[in-house]
UniProtKB/Swiss-Prot annotation:
NCBIfam families: NAPRTase, PRK05321.1. The modification Phosphohistidine is found at residue 214. This is Nicotinate phosphoribosyltransferase. The keyword Phosphoprotein applies. The lineage of its organism: Bacteria, Pseudomonadati, Pseudomonadota, Gammaproteobacteria, Lysobacterales. It comes from Xanthomonas campestris pv. campestris (strain ATCC 33913 / DSM 3586 / NCPPB 528 / LMG 568 / P 25).
Length: 398
């Protein structure tokens, strides 16, 4: 059994779920899985994956786990009560071997957003662990050696250069994830600020970290009053739910240009900062700082969070480039939790529909978008004033 607790997921799944409960409990959504790594035959392990999903759907939160969630300042009593009764339902999930693409799997999730939002992260962790335990021998000593070198590199930096673990969805295994976190905590001290994983935050006394994911802003392409106003509607909704708490805005759902047009003086003052998750991070940071300054907001009072494919070398270069012009935070994922030798999988589960309408992410990095509807992608680009997409190519890859 790979997943032992419903807390073994990223915090932002719970923070988004709370907002969904309070504001959009009837929303219906579709998610779709995609493996971007070529030549990966997941279909051969489909029965094993299915058994792990069955086990996941039998889990409920224990009383001490609900109490832990209640202890978080931003979790409201009614949401904790709801979670005490919650479980994932297999009826919302369909898993099959792909007939069109031998070796691939087709994994879709369809149902109420409130009841499906917690599927994504544990499903990705299950698929990763099933793959690696069947295709590689773990070299934990190599992983420890690499981790020690990363700790040494970070400790050579100023104390303000701090990282967090964001690696649940692409980890090598639950066991390795659980081993490396106390090593980081003890090795880095205050340079290790916490983890996105709620289960391990509880177990090791770490700070759980996270605010919102792409799906939250994507959903408002269908939930908001107008498509053009969808980002503003999503950010306003977040502000209503958290009243200034959890104030990191995600900037790349329809690209940085469109985001900055919507992120006006009100949002610049209200939110604590912004998160980078695609595109060139140095260019992104310079543009965000310039945007804040243009709105007479001191960037030194705001946090720039970097979380796109970071390794320790990139963390150090970003810190040296931007410090002390702003506050900085770094969420490191695969480079921490899946660096034992074997090549990590590039797998994702993305929302593709909400209330029957297509939704999409127009990433600042080519290849990171997923959408089933080419016409909608063109329309979305036009509405937000983005360059037309190329005529050729797979729309799911933009």
């Amino acid at each position: 059994m790979i997943i032992h607790s419903l807390l073994d997921t990223d915090l932002y799944k719970f923070t988004m779920m709370q907002a969904v409960l309070h504001q959009h409990p009837a929303a219906q959504v579709d998610y779709r899985f995609k493996c971007r790594t070529p030549g990966v035959d997941l279909a051969q392990f489909i029965d094993e994956i299915s058994r792990e999903i069955d086990a996941l759907c039998r889990l409920r939160l224990r009383e001490d786990e609900v109490d832990y969630l209640r202890s978080l300042r931003f979790i409201k009593p009614d949401f904790a009560d709801f979670l005490a009764l919650f479980h994932l339902d297999r009826k919302y999930l369909a898993l099959a071997a792909s007939a069109a693409h031998p070796g691939e799997i087709e994994l879709t999730i369809r149902g109420p957003w409130l009841h499906t939002i917690l599927f994504e992260v544990p499903l990705l962790a299950i698929i990763n662990e099933v793959w690696f335990r069947n295709t590689s021998e773990p070299d934990f000593e190599e992983g420890r050696s690499r981790l020690r070198e990363k700790v040494r590199s970070l400790r050579s930096m100023p104390a303000g250069c701090k990282i967090a673990d964001y690696g649940t969805r692409r980890r090598y295994s639950r066991q390795w994830h659980g081993e490396l976190l106390p090593l980081l905590r003890d090795g880095l001290g205050e340079q290790f600020v916490g983890t996105s994983n709620v289960f391990f935050a509880k177990q090791y006394g770490l700070t759980p970290l996270g605010t919102m994911a792409h799906e939250y802003l994507q959903a408002f392409q269908a939930l908001g009053p107008r498509l053009r106003d969808s980002q503003v509607a999503a950010l306003d909704s977040w502000a209503r739910e958290y009243r200034g708490d959890l104030g990191i805005a995600l900037s790349d759902v329809v690209g940085l240009d469109a985001f900055l047009r919507d992120f006006d003086l009100y949002f610049c003052k209200l939110f604590d900062g912004m998160r980078h998750d695609s595109g060139d991070p140095f260019d992104w940071g310079e543009r965000v700082i310039a945007h804040l300054e243009a709105h007479r907001v001191d960037p030194r009072t705001k946090v720039l969070v970097f979380s796109d494919g970071l390794n320790i070398d990139k963390v150090m270069r970003l810190y040296e480039h931007f410090s002390p012009r702003c506050r900085l935070a770094f969420g490191v994922g695969t480079s921490l939790t899946n660096d034992l030798g074997p090549t990590p999988l590039q797998i994702v589960i993305k929302m593709v529909r909400c209330n029957g309408q297509p939704v999409a992410k127009l990433s600042d990095s080519p290849g990171k978008s997923m959408c089933e509807d080419l016409g909608y992608l063109r329309y979305l680009r036009d509405v937000f004033g983005l360059p037309p997409m190329p005529e050729a190519g797979d729309p799911a890859r933009q």
